[in-house]
Amino acid sequence: PGPTLYADWGDMIQVTLKNSMPDNGTGIHWHGLRQYHTCTEDGVPGITECPLAPGDTKTYTFQATQFGTSWYHSHYSSQYGEGMLGGIVINGPATSNYDVDLGVYTISDWYYTPVFALGERIAHSQAGPPSGDNGLINGSMVAPAGQTGGKYTTNTITAGKKYRLRLINTSVDNHFMVSLDNHAFTVITSDFVPIVPYTANWIFIGIGQRYDVIITANQTVGSYWFRAEVQNGCGTNNNNGNIKSIFTYSGAASTTPSSSATPYTGRCTDETGIIPFWDSFVPSGPLSGNVEQLNVAINIGVDASGPIVTWGINLSAIDVDWKKPILQYVLDGNNSWPASENLIELPNAAQWYYWVIQEVPGNVNGNPVSINVPHPMHLHGHDFFLLGTGVGTYNNTINGPSLDYDNPTRRDVAMLPAGGWMVLAFQTDNPGAWLMHCHIAWHVSEGLAVQFQG
């Protein structure tokens, strides 16, 4: 990954990007940063800007209105899968004490074939995405069996100290369960949101999500494995079970761990019981009436060149125009944008909007087929309130009463369960054009996104 960017809460941040690539355009998105009243700085080609052309330079300017951990990455198709990403640390209060900040810990899948070539292959194949060839922790990993080279990321800790570790899933396709052998995590943030601390031996981290955890060095002096494992239904990786890093106590006789994993039950769903540290409440009245629904589905058709795979919302795969970003329409007062922009207007400021996101059967060669896949849904420009999730089809009469309006989970990436639903809410308090999309890079490049404008 690229260098980690550091700032303090409230700072004005300026970052200059130069595109030194010979062919591709690019643009940098500051993941999770709300860009409050600075939509032009969101860094999304075709939405808030034109791609930055080879040889050109652009300076992004925005304020750190949140604090915690995040990452920046290219938003030019699946380009970030080649490593065009890095961590962001914005210093601010913490909900639990610690002695040492170990910084960001990026966890990612890795492919030996260039991601643009893979993306084109996936878009024209009914076989689904390929397995990752390996995983990387902070950009490093030992090569799989039968290959040579590489190394584990290593960390040295001192007995009796407490360490803050900033976990970020920067993958293209893989979600992970993560753990440090013999050491519990005290979890203190969920994305950019400080939470009431809770303890876990393993945590699930979907693509784009972040968790800050505190590790207490209270075990026998030695070396211990940190593990990142892909679960069934959460993507596939050819080196699964061997994606690790090493934590070694000062004074340990060996830097090679012999520790064993804590048993756990695998899953591909979000952490539960997350309670934001500062209370927020969502009005419950509007959801008693009509509910806006966004249906997520795959479509596989065939043309003269073979299969064509798209993912869409409400039967439409987004198709943006890099030559004319949607923000240009908005600034010009022109609402004659193409329907393929998948733009939903939210005309009223300071209004609460409620959305049911539902995975529905797709269309494969003209036939309805259920291809149930979990989707990490990411919203730009806002933290959303996650009122509930479930499997099957959402029914407001049955599921509505169980939705949580009293200080619900708040974040910017949440997992839509495979074949299931999620209900989220946010207030229109940040003018602009904001993308909401699946953060599986193959899916968003195949169209799984909408825009909110208001």
Curated annotation (Swiss-Prot):
Cu cation 1 binds at H29, H378. It comes from the Eukaryota. GO terms for cellular component: extracellular region. Cu cation 4 binds at H375, C438, H443. Keywords: Copper, Glycoprotein, Lignin degradation, Metal-binding, Oxidoreductase, Repeat, Secreted. InterPro entries: Cu-oxidase-like_N, Cu-oxidase_2nd, Cu-oxidase_C, Cu-oxidase_fam, Cu_oxidase_CS, Cu_oxidase_Cu_BS, Cupredoxin. Gene3D superfamilies: Cupredoxins - blue copper proteins. It is found in: Secreted. Residues 1-95, 101-252, 319-454 form the Plastocyanin-like domain. Glycans are attached at N24, N138, N169, N218, N314, N334, N395. Cu cation 3 binds at H75, H380, H437. One of its GO terms (biological process) is lignin catabolic process. Pfam families: Cu-oxidase, Cu-oxidase_2, Cu-oxidase_3. GO terms for molecular function: copper ion binding; hydroquinone:oxygen oxidoreductase activity. Binds 4 Cu cations per monomer. Its EC number is 1.10.3.2. PANTHER family: LACCASE, MULTI-COPPER OXIDASE. Belongs to the multicopper oxidase family. Lignin degradation and detoxification of lignin-derived products. This is Laccase-3.
